[in-house]
Amino acid sequence: RCHGTAHIWIARANEKSGCEVLLQKRSAWKDSNPGCYDISSAGHLSAGDTYLEGALREIGEELGIHAEAEELRDLGLLEKVSHGVFYGKPFHDHEVSAVYLYTKPVEAEKLHLQESEVEAVRWMDLKECQKAVREGSIPNCIDIRELEMIEKSTTPYVYNDSNYKRVQYTRYAD
């Protein structure tokens, strides 16, 4: 059965490649991917939630950011299907994720991290992050397609760009 998730990337301008993203390090207590670097903020939708409502809730719960709807830029949808074994039982996941970009100024050291979810956060240059994810040089559970969506979006660090056109990315995982 398919379920929805909201993925919120926090980005800011930098001089190196033009953009850097805020990564969260998942809590060591998480069932899945403990201690791995991940999306700035993400979570499953609650019953009746829209993607946007879920995104606003998650960024508030995990990082203490009280964003407004117009501050989240919709980058599109991603579909992911995965199969495996989780705690000795077959695991089948089919999710559709709405990917958002938040570019208002954020000071990582002033965030209020939800300890049960987030161990730490760090800024990383977008190009370096893409390379690290492709090479597996940092422990991560990041879908490279999301970093590509950020890169392909027009000037991702410009807040509320009215010339932006919604792009939908959909591809099944192997």
Regions found by a protein language model. Name each.
Residues 1-7, 17-62:
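Conserved Nudix-box catalytic region and its N-terminal flanking loop in Nudix hydrolases
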Residues 10, 64-66, 89-92:
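Short, conserved, surface-exposed binding loops centered on an aromatic residue
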Residues 11-13, 103:
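A generic structural motif
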Residues 13-20, 89:
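Short, solvent-exposed loop/turn segments that connect beta-strands within catalytic domains
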Residues 14, 27, 78:
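Short, flexible active-site-adjacent loop segments at beta-strand->alpha-helix junctions, enriched
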Residues 15-16, 64-68, 107-110:
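Secondary-structure boundary elements
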Residues 35-37, 41, 78-174:
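Nudix hydrolase/Nudix homology domain
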Residues 66-77:
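A short coil-to-beta-strand element that immediately follows conserved catalytic motifs
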